[in-house]
Amino acid sequence: REWVILDTLHRESLHTLLEEFGCKGVSEERVEHLNRMWHRLRPWSDSVEGLERLKKRFILATLSNGNVALLVNMAKFSSLPWDTILGAEVSRSFKPMPHTYLTTASMLGLAPEECMMVAAHNSDLQVASGLGFRTSFVCRPEEYGPKQRTDLEAEDDYDLIADDFI
């Protein structure tokens, strides 16, 4: 399949779920509204303050599978202070493909070892570390909901390990 943005994949998944659960007659306008909920996610309570502190000394960029419009809207909605939005749409590849990580560093004019990947997902950090990025694990025990079974702790010797951004 040709590469598509995450909004498209979310919409396809939403249509599949609506069909699977027998939700008939949902208007395309409603589907679009539901699909754009991703654009209006609220950040963790410590994120904005922590990112603002980091921004005083470091370049803050996304390395997300989200498309640019999704991430810009999310940033505006939640006041996330990114310096730039990078990741999957820019590299036209999704994590965990190495190209996604390396393109992000390259777009910033940096070598991987000059960057720090911060994530709540061990798999993200393991790939980044293998490519030479510095890494920071931030534990988010409800990232996947109250019954989360993975990413409850750092699974490797990352450069930094924290419970929050503050």
Predicted segments — roles?
Residues 57-58, 132:
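Glycine-centered short loops/turns at secondary-structure junctions
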Residues 16, 20, 53, 57, ...:
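Solvent-exposed, charged/polar functional surfaces in cytosolic regulatory/catalytic domains
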Residues 48, 52, 63-166:
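Asp-based, Mg2+/Mn2+-dependent phosphohydrolase catalytic module
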Residues 32-40:
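Surface-exposed cleft-lining segments at the edges of enzyme active sites
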Residues 1-32:
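A metal-dependent, Asp-based hydrolase signature
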